[in-house]
Each structure stands twice: as structure tokens, then as C-alpha cells.
Amino acid sequence: MKICLVDETGAGDGALSVLAARWGLEHDENNPMALVLTTAHLELRKRDEPKLGGIFVDFVGGAMAHRRKFGGGRGEAVAKAVGIKGDYLPDVVDATAGLGRDAFVLASVGCRVRMLERNPVVAALLDDGLARGYADPEIGPWLQERLQLIHASSLTALTDITPRPQVVYLDPMFPHKQKSALVKKEMRVFQSLVGPDLDADGLLAPARQLATKRVVVKRPDYAPPLADIATPNAVVTKGHRFDIYTGTALVE
């Protein structure tokens, strides 16, 4: 994949070249999207809109730390939707990981989560965020146990993941009605890179085959159900709904 690669560390140690080789990225000086290695982290920038700033994955500080400490925890809609109750903490495959926010929330309340991300740039951002998270003395020990990244397309990987998870979580990119400033900023940068998930409808069937209990699909409130398959079961919040579908039970 072609993207503008920028090293701002001043270290001259070739770290960016190693990273590019690992994720199959090719430097393109004229690409409007830039992957930038700073002294603090790896970030994505939209070069023709510098005011939007950089997007990076941060599990340790910022919004994610606030959500972990002061958010709803088990009471969060995503936690309710995957079925967390009492001692039951399902094993989850997040098949559209994105920036890893929902996966992190589930991991922080105790679920083991395997994140799938097919876009190599997004996977590189996630991997960078995970590395910093794993190294953190406070969250590192449990994060290493509960949150991992698999760089693969969900459309192919969903058929051969083992062991099978109890829950598959899907949050396909859907064209957003622009509301909050944050959504505007992140989505403009993000959608410039990955665009909408035009093949997302194809995820529902393999997800239901893989999950032993349920599939949860996050949708904006104005979006039709995935693959136009309606379900009466959903957790509804302001602006979103989490549609719940049955999985395929394990055969003893």
C-alpha cells in the first residue's frame, strides 16, 4: 500500500523503514495521507488538511484512560450487547477493529479480545498503540493477556480463526452524518484512508458461523441493518444501535 512515510524522530535508526517493510507500505511522496513516526508515537495525517492534526492509538492516556476509569464499564452499551453478565466474560473477535476503542473497553472489563484489521496502515497504528499499552506498568499486564491484533481481512479470516469466539463484534465503516467535531476530524482522516466498508454485508454470514453465541453489529441509528437482515434484538443508545444476531453453537 502506498502512503507518504515521514520520520520526525531525528534518530536516523531506520525504524520507519523497518515498520514499512513489516506492514508492506511503500513511500509515495505525493500521497495526501502521511504516516508519521514522531518521538512519542506513530500517527496518521491528512496532508492537505493539517488543521485536523494526527490520529494515533492511545490506550494509556487521553480519552481511553478517561473511559476506562470513569466510563460505564460493564454498563457500557457494547458490554451489554456482547452479553457480559455476572462471571460471564465472553471471548470476542472484533472483526473491524479500527482504532481499537470498543475492543479496549471490552478488554478493560475482562474479556479476551482478538482484533482483526485488514488495512495495513490502521494495523500499524493499532500495533504501535498496543506496544505502548503493553509497556505501561498500570494496564500492561492485563492488556497483554486480553487484547491482541491479527492483521488480516475479516472476509477470509473469519472462516479459520481458532479457537472459535463466543462473540464476533462488527462495526463496519458507514458514511457518517457529520455531527460532533471529533467525529468530523477522525472520520475525515480515517475515511480518506480506508473509505466505507463496501463489502461489509459479506461479513454477517461468516461471523454467525464463527461465533458460538452471538454476533453484535454496531450501526448508526439511521443505517439499515447489515446485509438487510433485521433482528428484533438490539441495545439502543443515543445515535447508535447494537444489533444482536445468534451465532452457531459448538457441536459437542
From Swiss-Prot:
<keyword id="KW-0698">rRNA processing</keyword>
<dbReference type="Pfam" id="PF04445">
    <property type="entry name" value="SAM_MT"/>
</dbReference>
<comment type="similarity">
    <text>Belongs to the methyltransferase superfamily. RsmJ family.</text>
</comment>
<keyword id="KW-0808">Transferase</keyword>
<protein>
    <recommendedName>
        <fullName>Ribosomal RNA small subunit methyltransferase J</fullName>
        <ecNumber>2.1.1.242</ecNumber>
    </recommendedName>
</protein>
<feature type="binding site">
    <location>
        <begin position="101"/>
        <end position="102"/>
    </location>
    <ligand>
        <name>S-adenosyl-L-methionine</name>
    </ligand>
</feature>
<keyword id="KW-0489">Methyltransferase</keyword>
<feature type="binding site">
    <location>
        <begin position="117"/>
        <end position="118"/>
    </location>
    <ligand>
        <name>S-adenosyl-L-methionine</name>
    </ligand>
</feature>
<feature type="binding site">
    <location>
        <begin position="153"/>
        <end position="154"/>
    </location>
    <ligand>
        <name>S-adenosyl-L-methionine</name>
    </ligand>
</feature>
<dbReference type="GO" id="GO:0008990">
    <property type="term" value="F:rRNA (guanine-N2-)-methyltransferase activity"/>
</dbReference>
<feature type="binding site">
    <location>
        <position position="171"/>
    </location>
    <ligand>
        <name>S-adenosyl-L-methionine</name>
    </ligand>
</feature>
<keyword id="KW-0949">S-adenosyl-L-methionine</keyword>
<keyword id="KW-0963">Cytoplasm</keyword>
<comment type="function">
    <text>Specifically methylates the guanosine in position 1516 of 16S rRNA.</text>
</comment>
<dbReference type="InterPro" id="IPR029063">
    <property type="entry name" value="SAM-dependent_MTases_sf"/>
</dbReference>
<dbReference type="GO" id="GO:0005737">
    <property type="term" value="C:cytoplasm"/>
</dbReference>
<dbReference type="InterPro" id="IPR007536">
    <property type="entry name" value="16SrRNA_methylTrfase_J"/>
</dbReference>
